[in-house]
């Protein structure tokens, strides 16, 4: 049986529209989970792994408040990319994005939907992100390309927290474009020379505990 070219065109057009709608629906589910958490405070243990410099494990306090206030408070130094520390950014799950459904993929024993997200805000630092989202709308993996901080990726582990907050996040990032806190005393010129001949990828593992959620966190915490 011969198929009419117009029929094939309409079929693929419909399929494309369905995939687009499905991607938006999945992001909407993530957004709904996200909006349940108005604020939180948590304890964090940060382990940074960089080939050419030894960095001790740090303890930190983490503060978050909607829509985009985020603070790591740690004594001394904790090397993290600015975007990597605040992965649930509004830039990725608000309505001002183009979302494209790619495929299904299994991470561990979790079936996820892979979505590419392009922020439409010209001022967004994020150019393109790929999200691996489970059927209960938790992000298990993220890869982002940014204008100013290179490329970073993150993998999330969860326990049974009622607000679907992660127990651990493992972030891989470009060491030369990471956020360096004020007061960091390492010789950056020497560090940059070493990084030119070695792997410039760093890894940070952040373990969270002691979440306090929706306590009415003051804006003063972020000043």
Where are these regions (language model features)?
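An acidic-aromatic
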Residues: 49-108
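Gly/Pro-enriched, hydrophobic low-complexity segments
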Residues: 111-220
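One face of beta-strands
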Residues: 40-46, 60-62, 68-76, 129, ...
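Edge/loop elements at the starts and ends of beta-strands within beta-rich repeat scaffolds
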Residues: 33-40, 53, 108-110, 135, ...
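N-terminal leader/targeting segments and the immediate start of mature chains
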Residues: 15-45, 49-51
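Sec-dependent N-terminal signal peptides
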Residues: 5-14
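A short, amphipathic edge element
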Residues: 23-25, 91-101, 149-150, 202-206
């Amino acid at each position: 049986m011969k198929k009419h070219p117009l029929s094939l065109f309409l079929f693929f057009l419909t399929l494309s529209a369905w995939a687009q709608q499905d991607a938006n629906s999945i992001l909407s589910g993530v957004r709904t989970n996200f909006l349940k958490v108005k604020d939180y405070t948590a304890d964090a243990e940060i382990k940074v792994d960089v080939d050419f410099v030894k960095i001790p494990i740090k303890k930190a306090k983490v503060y978050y408040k909607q829509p985009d206030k985020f603070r790591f408070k740690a004594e001394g130094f904790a090397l993290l990319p600015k975007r990597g520390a605040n992965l649930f950014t509004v830039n990725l799950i608000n309505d001002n994005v183009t979302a494209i459904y790619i495929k299904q993929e299994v991470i561990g024993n979790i079936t996820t939907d892979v979505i590419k997200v392009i922020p439409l805000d010209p001022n967004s630092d994020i150019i393109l992100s790929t999200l691996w989202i489970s059927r209960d709308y938790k992000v298990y993996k993220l890869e982002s390309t940014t204008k100013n901080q290179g490329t970073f990726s993150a993998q999330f582990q969860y326990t049974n927290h009622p607000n679907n907050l992660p127990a651990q996040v493992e972030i891989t990032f470009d060491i030369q474009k990471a956020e360096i806190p004020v007061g960091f005393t390492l010789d950056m010129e020497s560090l940059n020379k070493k990084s030119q001949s070695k792997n410039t990828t760093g890894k940070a593992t952040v373990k969270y505990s002691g979440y306090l959620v929706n306590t009415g966190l003051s804006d003063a915490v972020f000043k």
